[in-house]
Amino acid sequence: VHRMEPVVDNIPARKLDQIAAVFRGHFTTLGRVAPGLTGARRLDRDMAKAWVDAVFGRCTLCGRCSLNCAVGINLPAVFKAARASLASMGLVPADLQATVDIALETGNNMGVSKEDWLETVAWIEEELQMELDDPTARIPVDKPGARVLFTVNPREPKFFPLSLQASAKLFHLAGEDWTVASEGWDLTNYGLFNGNPQQAGTLNRALLDAMERLGCQMLVIGECGHGYASARWEGPEWQQAAPPFPIVSVLELMRDYLREGRITLDPTKVAARVTLHDPCNLVRHGHLHEVLCGGAEHLPLGF
């Protein structure tokens, strides 16, 4: 291992050892009585500083280490617990906490105002109609009872609005009954990373409130791995209740469109060979490997 990663502090076992040392120091008899024999430590200022570096600075919670762990330890769960301890002490890195704070204050992590969001949607709708030469192409907003409530990453209206246009085009061509929300449209949740379950639950609640307000049938999480993980898997834990509607990734929906023939692909448009990446939150944590492969088999490309 040391040849693969010469920086010892980057090795997952080293990070785990720092957390386990504190556990032994506080919660085991031998660790309290004879810390020198067990390597036990108290959670003092120096150890807290070391934790910040280990679980925030040197860990993304991707879970790759657990796949290679000889005894199957769920390392991301341990590191999340350490982050929660640090969050309770106000030791979340400032830039990460600032992202959470702006989402709590404005409803999205980019601070996009409601007016700007709706203006962007209206503009992209016009662009979509011109692209397709079809005045019926729409981006519905707050459509009651729509089958699909589509949520987006705030970077799209802020920096990459054509991504929203591409999604809207697919929904239109598939004949989907869909809508976006005027409020509760941000799929991201950096509370997944800062270790504060109360703040994470508040951000997650915004999506659930939008679903309840509009009476939609399915919550679709757009392109974002951690957004899917937080809504689909962590959300029920934060809310202590399962949602009364399905929560799916847009990848699952696109896979279904391809299988059902609601959209088709032209093999002459793309000639490049590509490979399929199994991302951490969608595959290692989200269990969507079969979904990705099921969609990929419909693509007119060589893998």
Please tell me what each predicted stretch does.
Residues Q165-K169, P236-E237, E290-H298:
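Short, solvent-exposed amphipathic alpha-helical segments in soluble enzyme
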Residues A174, A241-P243, L299-P300:
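Short, structured coil segments at secondary-structure junctions
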Residues D9-S230, E234-G235:
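Iron-sulfur-cluster electron-transfer modules
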Residues Q240-T268:
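Short, flexible loop segments at boundaries between secondary-structure elements
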Residues D177-T179, P246, G302-F303:
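Conserved beta-strand segments of alpha/beta enzyme cores
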Residues P12, A20, L258-F303:
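Redox cofactor-anchoring modules in respiratory/redox and cofactor-processing assemblies
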Residues V1-V8:
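Long, charged N-terminal interaction/targeting segments
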Residues V152, S249-L251, D278:
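Short, structured patches in soluble enzyme cores that scaffold and shape functional sites
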